[in-house]
């Protein structure tokens, strides 16, 4: 996260009941969640090779009374038995979309293999044992597929107060979500972009969307 979660919580006076983290990778943000008193965390990661890392982190953070649930699927606007996941030499750049301008900007990062994985709507994981009322913040980092994933969250967005997401101003991945796509989709659910940060390159960065007061 380029933008400090502590600063976000303080500036927008957020009370984080729980986080839905889509594209959890190796759980790098878990300590930040702990520092900001987040007790309920959902980690969704498409790359099955990273799940053991997340399970180990869950074991460690259980000692700090964090409730962590781990899911291995690609967050998508529909539920499918199989979808392609393109694994890259830097696993943080892996995506369900193929590299495009990313190859020009970061030529050392290449696709190394393709996995066939399940895809699922995020709003389908909630039930009597996993209550959406315990979650009000989405953190999404899935390399250009943000709109597809957020469409699969549409049934729970009324419960969400803030969304932190990676954004693209150019096609780093083939047919990737551009920031204006996110703006136009999320405004329908009452979210406005309040912070934009592009510290590494002008074509991509992070953004924070907050639900505007009614």
Model-derived regions, located:
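Phosphate/nucleotide-binding beta-alpha loop and adjacent structural elements of enzyme active sites
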Residues: 1-214
């Amino acid at each position: 996260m380029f933008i400090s979660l502590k600063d976000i919580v303080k500036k927008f006076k957020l009370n984080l009941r729980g986080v839905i983290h889509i594209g959890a990778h190796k759980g790098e943000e878990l300590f930040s969640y702990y520092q900001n008193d987040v007790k309920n965390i959902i980690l969704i990661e498409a790359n099955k090779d990273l799940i053991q890392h997340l399970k180990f982190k869950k074991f460690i953070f259980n000692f700090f009374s964090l409730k962590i649930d781990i899911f291995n699927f690609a967050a998508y606007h529909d539920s499918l038995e199989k979808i392609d996941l393109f694994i890259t030499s830097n696993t943080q750049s892996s995506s369900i979309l193929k590299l495009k301008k990313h190859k020009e900007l970061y030529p050392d990062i290449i696709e190394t293999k393709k996995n066939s994985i399940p895809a699922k709507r995020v709003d389908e994981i909630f039930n009597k044992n996993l209550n959406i009322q315990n979650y009000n913040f989405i953190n999404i980092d899935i390399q250009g597929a943000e709109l597809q994933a957020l469409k699969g969250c549409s049934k729970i967005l009324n419960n969400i107060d803030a969304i932190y997401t990676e954004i693209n101003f150019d096609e780093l991945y083939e047919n990737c979500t551009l920031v204006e796509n996110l703006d136009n989709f999320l405004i329908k659910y009452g979210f406005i972009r309040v912070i934009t940060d592009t510290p590494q390159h002008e074509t991509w960065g992070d953004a924070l969307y907050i639900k505007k007061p009614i």
